[in-house]
């Protein structure tokens, strides 16, 4: 739709062969003043002389985003057909995912394209994030430890990547721990829409979800840096709670430092909790029974189970992170 802002008059444009109900996902004007439209049936170029859009017949995949890089290449993100590039000499080239080739596009389902603060081309895909290296003509995967690799949108602000996913929003700063935000942090929901991210002129970031828009100032997003203490809340022997004052436990758990069991009392369950009450659903734990576990066991659960323990002396260790990890 083209609207005259002075009069409010509107004009609807369709591409050749496009049904009236077809979706358009993106409009982009490149440096050559060409006007492109990304639609359900591919990419379309506006013909100013004929006042209509013409379909690019080279590909028909659903096209969701269009961006131009500093070299004058126009990139088209498709959902299923990978990336198409139109260079400054009007030569087309397709980039697709190749199995077992780490230098290829990480997924053919591309949700969003972003030109970085130094001119880099990033592609957020259904299987993670990658960067195009123009000097080599290859892609480099950017490994981000997130609950979902379905990255729907990407916004870069002051060197920090904010990525919407199918399981919340990820804050990624190279060299620092990844931080996850979800509905427990105030988001409308955890499911976000492809190519629905925006960095506004006032610095606010917008992400579109299946339940409306979420917006925030990045500098106001504070990280909880207080490591929470952890309390042992219960110990069970063969599935039954051990009570204070019993043969096994002289004092209450909050005051006890040891548990005395006979050699045949060898199946125990230990429950614990982080004393952090800001979004406690996001607390994470690591525990280890010295003499049994060689390494820390990381979990979202707050319970450790041990069966058939040999006779001996053991030390149970547990630690936790808060809602911001």
Give the ranges of each region predicted by the language model.
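Glycine-centered loop/turn positions within well-structured domains
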Residues: 1, 11, 43-44, 51, ...
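Residue-level detector of Asp-centered blade-edge/turn motifs that repeat once per structural unit
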Residues: 29-33, 68-72, 115-118, 156-159, ...
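Sequence-structural signature of mature extracellular/luminal beta-sheet repeat domains
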Residues: 1-6, 25, 29, 34-37, ...
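Residue-level "micro-hotspots" composed of small/polar
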Residues: 17-23, 58-62, 93, 97-111, ...
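Conserved beta-propeller blade signature
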Residues: 1, 34-37, 73-76, 120-123, ...
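Hydrophobic alpha-helical segments, especially N-terminal targeting/anchoring helices
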Residues: 3-4, 29, 68, 77, ...
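Short loop/turn segments that connect beta-strands within beta-propeller blades
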Residues: 4-8, 47-51, 87-91, 133-137, ...
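Surface-exposed loop/turn positions within WD40 beta-propeller blades
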Residues: 32, 40-41, 71, 80, ...
């Amino acid at each position: 739709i083209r609207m005259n802002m002075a009069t409010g008059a509107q004009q609807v444009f369709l591409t050749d062969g496009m049904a009236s109900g077809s979706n358009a996902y993106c409009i982009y004007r490149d440096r050559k003043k060409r006007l492109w439209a990304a639609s359900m049936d591919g990419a379309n170029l506006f013909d100013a002389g004929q006042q209509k859009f013409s379909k690019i017949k080279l590909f028909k995949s659903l096209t969701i985003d269009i961006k131009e890089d500093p070299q004058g290449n126009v990139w088209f993100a498709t959902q299923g057909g990978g990336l198409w590039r139109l260079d400054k000499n009007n030569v087309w080239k397709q980039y697709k995912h190749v199995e077992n080739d780490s230098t290829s596009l990480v997924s053919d389902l591309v949700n969003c394209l972003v030109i970085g603060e130094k001119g880099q081309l990033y592609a957020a895909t259904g299987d993670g994030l990658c960067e195009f290296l123009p000097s080599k003509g290859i892609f480099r995967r950017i490994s981000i430890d997130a609950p979902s690799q379905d990255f729907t949108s990407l916004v870069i602000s002051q060197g920090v990547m904010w990525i919407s996913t199918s399981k919340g929003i990820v804050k990624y700063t190279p060299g620092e721990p990844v931080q996850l935000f979800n509905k427990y942090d105030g988001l409308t929901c955890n499911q976000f829409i492809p190519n629905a991210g925006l960095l506004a002129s006032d610095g606010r970031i917008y992400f579109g979800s299946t339940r409306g828009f979420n917006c925030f100032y990045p500098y106001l997003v504070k990280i909880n840096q207080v490591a929470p203490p952890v309390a042992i809340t219960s110990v069970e022997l063969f599935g039954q709670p051990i009570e204070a004052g019993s043969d096994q436990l002289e004092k209450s758990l909050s005051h006890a430092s040891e548990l005395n069991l006979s050699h045949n009392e060898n199946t125990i369950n230990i429950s614990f909790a982080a004393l952090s009450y800001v979004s406690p659903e996001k607390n994470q734990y690591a525990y280890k029974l010295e003499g049994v576990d060689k390494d820390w066991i990381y979990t979202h659960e707050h319970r450790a189970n041990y069966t058939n323990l040999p006779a001996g002396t053991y030390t149970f260790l547990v630690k936790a992170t808060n809602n911001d990890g």
